[in-house]
A protein has these predicted regions:
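Acidic, metal-coordinating helix/loop segments flanking the phosphotransfer/catalytic sites
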Residues: 35-55, 119
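Active-site residues of response regulator receiver
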Residues: 58-59
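Two-component/phosphorelay signaling modules centered on CheY-like receiver
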Residues: 14-35
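Receiver (REC) domain active-site loop signature in two-component systems and cognate sites
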Residues: 62
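C-terminal output helix
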Residues: 113-124
Length: 130
């Protein structure tokens, strides 16, 4: 299945980016995913691209500008506040979940460690770009 709407995916972990790409291939999905390393790069991307992504995915633990700070900045910005933001992170901490929900995250998912579980993550992102 081909999806033309862009996903901006912020995660500094190369292994996780590989998991995302491999899970997408295993599902036979053609997704337009742009990977960046941190929140600062999210805003650099948004400020330099003509097209706003349909979805932003954030890890919480990133250098320079972490996922919480990035989410807060996005939701306070009139230009970007309506873009759905999904958190995909290693933290299952209830406080992190509550903070992200309060800041406006559309969905909070804990990173898995297998291809089949990563495929479930990808399937949960698709409704935001369909």
């Amino acid at each position: 299945m081909t999806y033309t709407k862009k996903i901006l995916y912020a995660d500094d972990d190369l292994d996780d980016k590989t998991w995302v790409s491999e899970a997408t291939e295993l599902l036979n999905y053609q997704l337009d995913i742009e990977f960046v390393e941190n929140g600062r790069q999210v805003f650099e991307y948004l400020e330099t691209q003509m097209e706003v992504p349909a979805l932003i995915v954030l890890d919480l633990n990133m250098p320079e500008l972490d996922g919480r700070q990035t989410l807060k900045k996005l939701k306070l910005n009139n230009k970007y506040k309506n873009i759905p933001v999904v958190i995909v992170t290693t933290s299952a901490n209830k406080i992190d979940v509550e903070i992200c929900n309060r800041l406006g995250a559309s969905l909070y998912l804990v990173k898995p460690d297998s291809h089949s579980e990563w495929q479930l993550i990808i399937k949960q992102l698709v409704p935001y770009i369909s």
